[in-house]
Amino acid sequence: MFGYSHVNRQYDMHMREWYTDDRIVGVLQDCEKAGINTWQASFNWDMKRIFPKLRGAGCNIQFICLAASWHFDEKMGRTPEEVLDGTIKCAQAAMEFKPIGIAFHGHATDLLFRAGKIDLLKTYVDKVHDMGAAAGISTHNPKILATLHEKGFGNDFYMAGLHYLSRHPEDWIAELGTVPVDEGWIASDPPKMAAAVRQVDKPALVYKVLSAGRKCSSEDQKRKAIAWAYQNIKPIDATIIGIYPRYSNQVAETTQMVREALS
């Protein structure tokens, strides 16, 4: 809803143009009516306008926030300590909207891991618990998910990207011998993350189920991608599926596909 298309800047703008405050409220009302009880979104300062309108319209959908230092202030530094501090500040700002959970951003987690500072996440988890919300940790890398499980930082849930979008060029060279033009969406990623998700004992919210629209060429392709996700995660897990209902009723379409997958 805030223009994260994972396609290009033009498509980001296309989404932002359509998703006015009133449309965001309307879509979330439609979600709630269709049986979707939780909205997950990255922290955005526009929420200070949107949430009063949303609650004023009688929508009680739950909110899970994805926090990152750059969402709080894009000018903040990117050292591990600065990312931790900024993400905690982001989580504190998000508490205004009464989230049921706040997750540490996947790119931020992956940054800490590369820097050998993954233990800083324990501080984040403790701070979010002190705020009164469930604490989550997101990642794009199945190896990091396994490490988090071993470390046992006390978080309540994970967010797990089915595509490893935080690879560095050297990672691509080591794995595939080349570097992609875009973020890098490859078919071998989802099974690896799904396998890691099945090995952790906490709930995981799995995202990039439709590969940011790359598995939306047909209704059958979408249906198969959603079914595959549910067939390969734990019963206590759930999916995060982005919608952009500009041209069709994606709320109804997606909820129907999820119900079919779970039937």
Identify the residue ranges that each predicted region occupies.
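Catalytic beta/alpha-barrel core
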Residues: 39-43, 101-116, 134-141, 159-164, ...
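Histidine/lysine/aspartate-rich catalytic loop segments that bind and position anionic ligands
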Residues: 149-180, 184
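Alpha-helix-loop-beta-strand connector modules within alpha/beta enzyme cores
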Residues: 21-26, 47-73, 118-133, 185-206, ...
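Glycine-enriched alpha-helix->loop->beta-strand junction motifs that scaffold or abut catalytic
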Residues: 57-60, 98-99, 129-131, 150-159, ...
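Active-site beta->alpha loop and helix N-cap motifs at the rims of alpha/beta catalytic domains
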Residues: 10-116
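Hydrophobic faces of well-ordered beta-strands that scaffold small-molecule active sites
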Residues: 1-4, 39-41, 61-66, 100-104, ...
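Structured C-terminal cap/extension of enzyme domains
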Residues: 11-16, 21-31, 35-40, 56, ...
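Glycine-rich phosphate-binding active-site loops on the catalytic face of alpha/beta enzymes
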Residues: 108, 157-168, 232-247
